[in-house]
Regions:
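Conserved, function-defining micro-sites of small-solute handling proteins
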Residues: 1-171
């Protein structure tokens, strides 16, 4: 199994997938997704967890075979590809981004920056660009700083046991 680097999102997602299906494999960390993709195309690695936007061109060119989308639902980037859940695996892994501020940042500043970020994310040009790279924004009820805080804590809880079981640690 290859990833774009130790501790990368792809590494964590593949590791969680491996745990969900009960396999133990050797992790081959690369210095970025490009070299890993090259070795996948060349047949030097067995599989690679990466973003659908990263793999789309190679999938379309039939250079690689996509197996599953790891998010709950199908991706707009690869709509023909079933999710792992649709294929019978009770598993979900997604890449997400949040905006974080230093501890102690005054609430009015957080709210002002939050509101500006949400407004920018909702513009047609940003929505179009996100669509081009296979990304989506979350529903409005999931956009608050309080929701993000709860979500981050739930992600830590969800991932802690598999990370520990795999023996992963920060270097």
């Amino acid at each position: 199994m290859a990833s774009a680097g130790a501790g990368s999102t792809g590494h964590l997602d593949c590791m969680l997938l491996n745990a969900a299906i009960g396999i133990n494999v050797t992790h081959v960390p690369y210095r970025g997704g490009g070299p890993a993709m090259q070795d996948l195309i060349a047949g030097r690695i067995d599989y690679f967890c990466t973003l659908s936007a990263t793999a789309r061109q190679q999938v379309d060119g039939k250079l690689i075979k996509a197996i599953a989308i790891l998010s709950r639902d199908r991706s707009a980037m690869l709509p023909e590809l079933a999710s792992a859940r649709e294929q019978g695996l009770d598993f979900e892994a997604t890449t997400w981004f949040g905006f974080f501020f230093p501890k102690g940042t005054p609430e009015p500043i957080i709210q002002k920056l939050h509101d500006a970020t949400v407004a920018a994310m909702d513009t047609p040009s940003v929505q179009e660009r996100l669509k081009e790279v296979g990304a989506v924004t979350v529903a409005s009820e999931r956009r608050s700083p309080a929701y993000l805080q709860k979500f981050v804590l739930s992600e830590i809880e969800k991932n802690a046991a598999p990370i520990k079981a795999a023996g992963l640690a920060m270097d």
